[in-house]
């Protein structure tokens, strides 16, 4: 995406924290809800307001059935990503087709208009070690 999108960059942790503070976003809750930014000014140090940049959430595909972006794209989206997308005018969803070497960037309203279907999926992390028998819950 760096080669395709003018002004795209992946901010450092400190840069990300300063942007979140500027926009009134809880960094601890949403720290992983943005992949990069697109600068609308010439340099990161010139960012003064939300109008100076866009938050970019990147979703990639190499699907053969996707001939023209964004049509036919399939991706996962966390609740936090979608909540931030809905609440921030300077948040963009960017779908990158790695085979076509193209991207499509959209705002929340366009995203809503393009959804064909949407379902909730839970992500489960199991314990990393076995519990002793006396620590197991009673059934």
PLM-predicted stretches and their roles:
Residues 85-139:
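Domain-level recognition of nuclease-like catalytic cores that cleave nucleotide substrates
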Residues 29-31, 60-62, 81, 97:
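Short, flexible loop/turn elements at secondary-structure junctions
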Residues 62-87:
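Mg2+/Mn2+-dependent nuclease catalytic core
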Residues 1-23:
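Acidic-basic catalytic patches of nuclease active cores, encompassing PD-(D/E)XK
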Residues 27, 36, 52-64:
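Conserved catalytic cores of phosphodiester-cleaving nucleases, focusing on short active-site segments
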Residues 18-19, 45-48, 82-87:
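A general structural signal for short secondary-structure junctions and capping/turn motifs
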């Amino acid at each position: 995406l760096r080669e395709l999108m003018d002004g795209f960059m992946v901010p450092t942790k400190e840069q990300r924290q300063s942007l979140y503070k500027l926009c009134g976003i809880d960094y601890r809750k949403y720290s992983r809800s943005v992949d990069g930014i697109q600068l609308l000014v010439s340099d990161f140090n010139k960012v003064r307001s939300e109008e100076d940049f866009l938050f970019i959430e990147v979703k990639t595909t190499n699907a053969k059935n996707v001939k023209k972006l964004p049509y036919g794209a399939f991706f996962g989206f966390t609740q936090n990503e979608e909540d931030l997308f809905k609440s921030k005018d300077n948040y963009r969803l960017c779908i990158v087709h790695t085979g076509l070497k193209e991207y499509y960037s959209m705002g929340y309203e366009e995203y809503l208009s393009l959804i064909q279907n949407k379902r909730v999926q839970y992500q489960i992390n199991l314990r990393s070690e076995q519990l002793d028998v006396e620590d197991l819950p009673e059934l």
